């Protein structure tokens, strides 16, 4: 890079970098737009992924395909699409899905099993109107960290979880989004942790298990687990479907947690303060026998900050939690998670990295 005041960028390069940052909102909004237009599915076409021009992706007779082409070019620059240009001129630009883009279509990379899950709903859920309204109020989280999170401030005081409880359509998108994100990780968990990690477990409790889908996946793979307990708020488990071998139990994890040989939880600790996390883990400790363990799957931020995709994804998600769910909820480093477990009475801790985003955190009594 050219020389500059910071020894890395020239003044012109620094200004260019800031121009990119200032306009970065165009990237997720363009991504949301092409998903709503059905572009990834049209390109994928059951696995064909043949390069197509913008005009081919729109209804016949569309007055100006160049508008879509501009979105596709932007997303090609971000690695979502590959751009193909012919040797002759004029030749229309054509686009196909990259490995990143294929995560937006069922069976294209979002879920190794090809179950039908994808990351498309995750993108759509993050850019619903109610969530987008929160971002201009992000500075309020700094000025008043103990007050309502930006989402609630922007939506007449209604927190995100209450909003999803009232808006059926938004809730369905959110549930599909969580499925799309969860399935690939759960497959990685079962492949890399699987039978050995759940050895000796006959009764498994899933804290915050929602519909019980993750518990069902585990029990389908680990046949030694005979009794599954899907534990969540009463109104959540009331809507959960029947699952063979699974009992749906309603309650409050801050009061008590059902007993089991092991306790599983995924993305539960992120939205709580250190004190609240310690309370949750303390109740887990009480519910376990000697040698029992908590298997918590959480994003773990690195100790040092760099520009890698992994670090950016983790830190961006941390701010999403701040803006949407809980200002004082936060993602943590491995050492911070270790201290939470020790404070709750656990004898040992280890972190297992099976996925670039989630880590498996093992707390043993």
Swiss-Prot record:
<keyword id="KW-0489">Methyltransferase</keyword>
<dbReference type="InterPro" id="IPR036388">
    <property type="entry name" value="WH-like_DNA-bd_sf"/>
</dbReference>
<dbReference type="Pfam" id="PF00891">
    <property type="entry name" value="Methyltransf_2"/>
</dbReference>
<dbReference type="InterPro" id="IPR029063">
    <property type="entry name" value="SAM-dependent_MTases_sf"/>
</dbReference>
<dbReference type="GO" id="GO:0008171">
    <property type="term" value="F:O-methyltransferase activity"/>
</dbReference>
<feature type="binding site">
    <location>
        <position position="232"/>
    </location>
    <ligand>
        <name>S-adenosyl-L-methionine</name>
    </ligand>
</feature>
<dbReference type="GO" id="GO:0046983">
    <property type="term" value="F:protein dimerization activity"/>
</dbReference>
<dbReference type="Pfam" id="PF08100">
    <property type="entry name" value="Dimerisation"/>
</dbReference>
<keyword id="KW-0808">Transferase</keyword>
<dbReference type="GO" id="GO:0009058">
    <property type="term" value="P:biosynthetic process"/>
</dbReference>
<dbReference type="InterPro" id="IPR012967">
    <property type="entry name" value="Plant_O-MeTrfase_dimerisation"/>
</dbReference>
<comment type="function">
    <text>Involved in nicotinate detoxification in planta. Catalyzes the conversion of nicotinate to N-methylnicotinate, which is a detoxified form of endogenous nicotinate in planta.</text>
</comment>
<dbReference type="InterPro" id="IPR036390">
    <property type="entry name" value="WH_DNA-bd_sf"/>
</dbReference>
<protein>
    <recommendedName>
        <fullName>Nicotinate N-methyltransferase 1</fullName>
        <ecNumber>2.1.1.7</ecNumber>
    </recommendedName>
</protein>
<dbReference type="GO" id="GO:1901847">
    <property type="term" value="P:nicotinate metabolic process"/>
</dbReference>
<keyword id="KW-0949">S-adenosyl-L-methionine</keyword>
<dbReference type="GO" id="GO:0032259">
    <property type="term" value="P:methylation"/>
</dbReference>
<dbReference type="InterPro" id="IPR016461">
    <property type="entry name" value="COMT-like"/>
</dbReference>
<dbReference type="InterPro" id="IPR001077">
    <property type="entry name" value="O_MeTrfase_dom"/>
</dbReference>
<dbReference type="GO" id="GO:0008938">
    <property type="term" value="F:nicotinate N-methyltransferase activity"/>
</dbReference>
<comment type="similarity">
    <text>Belongs to the class I-like SAM-binding methyltransferase superfamily. Cation-independent O-methyltransferase family.</text>
</comment>
<dbReference type="GO" id="GO:0008757">
    <property type="term" value="F:S-adenosylmethionine-dependent methyltransferase activity"/>
</dbReference>
